[in-house]
Design a protein with these regions (language model features):
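Active-site neighborhoods and metal-handling regions in enzymes and metal-associated proteins
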Residues: 1-158
Length: 158
């Protein structure tokens, strides 16, 4: 999946018929298979090689969210802890950028961030790009265990 400009704001955009313009961002969501296992990566790049100040600011928020989530991926933590970390960082960043107004705690509780960040931070990865496996067991978030493979790919849509 490769898209740019406003089309990069459409989750899993497929048409692929728009021209790439200077000032746009290009979103690449790609994967491959190797020896029966899947890979998945999502990255964003400026078309002309340089972020605008606004693009860079939002890119930095998402990068901080990704790093915060990665820090939560460890045995004993639950599936939801990396996602919760991204929600906190992204909500705080959207407030700092003036895209959300209010108190961080209230905006998270009301899910106001979902106007910009409407999906989960990642998914299981294995023999399929979106591999099988429960995220909850008996209504509780699943604990992460050694050997589990998951993606951490927060995205914002503005």
């Amino acid at each position: 999946l490769i898209c740019s400009g406003a089309n990069a704001c459409v989750l899993h955009y497929r048409a692929g018929n728009a021209a790439v313009k200077p000032g746009d961002l290009v979103l690449i969501d790609a994967g491959c298979e190797y020896q029966g296992y899947a890979a998945d990566i999502t990255r964003t790049f400026p078309v002309n090689g340089r972020f605008s100040p606004e693009q860079r600011a939002l890119y930095e928020v998402v990068l901080k969210a990704q790093l915060a989530a990665i820090a939560k991926v460890k045995p004993g933590n639950t599936w939801n802890q990396p996602h919760d970390a991204t929600v906190r960082v992204i909500t705080r960043g959207l407030i700092e950028l003036g895209l959300l107004k209010g108190k961080e705690k209230d905006l998270i509780k009301s899910e106001a961030y979902k106007d910009f960040y409407m999906h989960r931070a990642g998914h299981w990865l294995g023999m399929d790009v979106h591999d099988v496996g429960d995220y909850r067991i008996d209504g509780r978030w699943r604990q992460l265990e050694p050997g589990m493979v998951l993606t951490i790919e927060p995205l914002t849509f503005t």
